[in-house]
Amino acid sequence: MFDQASYLIMRHLEFLNLLCEVSRLIIKYAAKQDVDRVSLESVNRDKIISILIGFHDQINQLFKNTPKENLKNLGLDEILKTWAQESEEKIEYVQALDIQILELLNQEKQKTKEDIQNVYLNRRKLGGYNLSNVK
């Protein structure tokens, strides 16, 4: 049980670190207005989150019916506390990155909206002129 718990916890923490890394990449690409890369990394991020949920569920299932005394005897109580603390810190960090991502995406959305509006207005201005018959 100890080995399985250690493995699951370490993998969970590795994927949390990967989630942070991918979130930083999304910020980098969003700042460069590289929409294709933002989309690609967002898909990767969603997959990582699904994997994290799976690991979290497995860890919870592993300790679901285990008395706290057994956890203490195995030395898992401190490991679980440390894991919970590290997970919480990473999640807070990812939430801060999410705010940055949303701000950058909203800026890009506003820019795109303005570009579309300008194209529309320019077409309306030129709409009175029939330029197809000009020699």
Regions found by a protein language model. Give the residues of each.
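Extended, charge-rich alpha-helical scaffolding segments
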Residues: 2-81
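Short terminal interaction segments
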Residues: 75-135
